[in-house]
Amino acid sequence: MPDEGKVTIFVTSGPETPQRCATPFYMANIAAAMDNEAEMIFQIDGVLLMKKGVADDLFAKEGGKSIMDFIRDAKEADVEMKVCSAALQLHDMTEDDLIEECDGVVGAA
């Protein structure tokens, strides 16, 4: 039986499709506001959103909030954000490349 009150959102879009990057954070924040335990798992190109320096200058909409602002909002809402170990390898990244808002690495790769 699935965990009641827990929501997991998988993020696969990255900087190459910025218009898709804000929505997962909205969904996670809504889930957290509804008293659910919310977590986000960043896979494939989504892992790049957790790379230092990437989200600061990335915008889903011109003149809107940066993706880093969405990441900070999620942190304030106690959303847990983790990256897939295979996605780290795919992008030649290590844990040292990750922003401090990232809660760790999951997976067996």
Q: Can you say where each PLM-predicted feature lies in the sequence?
A:
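Short, glycine-rich nucleotide/cofactor-binding loops
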Residues: 8-22, 54-55
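C-terminal binding/interaction regions
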Residues: 94, 100-109
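Basic/polar N-terminal segments that are highly enriched at the extreme N-terminus
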Residues: 1-4
